[in-house]
């Protein structure tokens, strides 16, 4: 028997764009934008979709793929509880939810990367990132170099 996701018909939502979230995360408190997505659930179901691919949703600095905290929903969208309530509503309507999460790179504000910026070679996280080299600087002004996702130095690659 095939797993559910091989039989599912997915609908994709990029919530930061659809919900008009600010392009840069300067928010100090969480906005409750997930409630605005509730109106899409009947539409998704009426199209015959059985699953929602949503994301990115984790706390980030900009476009969402520059993750700075994998434990928190981006405050421009709401809180973890707001997201849980949205997912519960999807499930009540027979729609499964898959989250677009990035695990091969982070944003520059990710705590491990910030630790390298601060402690340099003394950082216990220096091996978490690919190509860390204290012999040259990055194009972003860091005192060390590192591999970046497709040359985008705001997205340092994890050493997986």
Residues covered by each model-derived region:
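N-terminal structural segment of carbohydrate-active enzymes
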Residues: 1-99, 104-160
């Amino acid at each position: 028997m095939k797993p559910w996701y091989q039989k599912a018909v997915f609908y994709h939502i990029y919530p930061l764009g659809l919900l008009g979230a600010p392009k840069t995360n300067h928010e100090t408190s969480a906005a409750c934008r997930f409630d605005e997505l509730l109106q899409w659930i009947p539409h998704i179901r009426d199209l015959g979709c059985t699953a929602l691919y949503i994301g990115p949703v984790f706390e980030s600095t900009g476009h969402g793929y520059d993750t700075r905290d994998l434990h928190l929903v981006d405050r421009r969208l709401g809180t973890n509880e707001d997201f849980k309530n949205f997912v519960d509503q999807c499930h009540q309507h027979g729609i499964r939810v898959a989250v677009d999460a990035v695990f091969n790179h982070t944003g520059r504000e990710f705590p491990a990367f910030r630790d390298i910026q601060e402690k340099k070679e003394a950082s216990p996280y220096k091996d978490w990132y690919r190509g860390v080299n204290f012999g040259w600087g990055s194009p972003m002004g860091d005192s060390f170099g590192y591999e970046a996702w497709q040359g985008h130095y705001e997205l340092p690659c994890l050493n997986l």
